[in-house]
């Protein structure tokens, strides 16, 4: 029983913390390694999924840089862990769908499988999500003035929430 406790304590103290630290270090160091590798002219002989992975990582970093330049007030509001998770998904999908042996590569060229098509569609969709321009999520709702008069409005905050955010707080007011 003491061995089980030892491994449980080892995992809690060392393994999970070092695993998390390694994932963070890999996420921080990956874009610089990819951009240094992109200047290498021998990149054309790599498989297409690895090439797409490096393009997606660079495009994802540029997306956050572009957002911070457009809106300097919200330069610290992007979610680093979301960026890290998407990078890891692209990396894992790229390596999972890459054919390593030459015999399988020749066979895959002759007979396209539906799994390969799904892999290409997933990677293309992720890459498109990373490279598309960010869209505004604010919705302009029309503010109806004149329906309610000032003496009938008891809560100005509730009216503001109802008009701007589309939240109805309280009973309906009859006109």
Curated annotation (Swiss-Prot):
One GO CC term, this protein: cytosol
InterPro entries reported in the protein's UniProt record: SecM
Family statement: Belongs to the SecM family.
GO molecular function: translation regulator activity
Compartmental location: Cytoplasm, Cytosol; Periplasm
Domain of life: Bacteria
Signal peptide extent: 1-38
Identification of the protein by name: Secretion monitor
Keyword Transcription regulation: no
Free-text function comment from the UniProt entry: Regulates secA expression by translational coupling of the secM secA operon. Translational pausing at a specific Pro residue 5 residues before the end of the protein may allow disruption of a mRNA repressor helix that normally suppresses secA translation initiation.
Cross-referenced HAMAP family: SecM
ATP-binding keyword on record: no
Gene: secM
Keywords: Cytoplasm, Periplasm, Signal
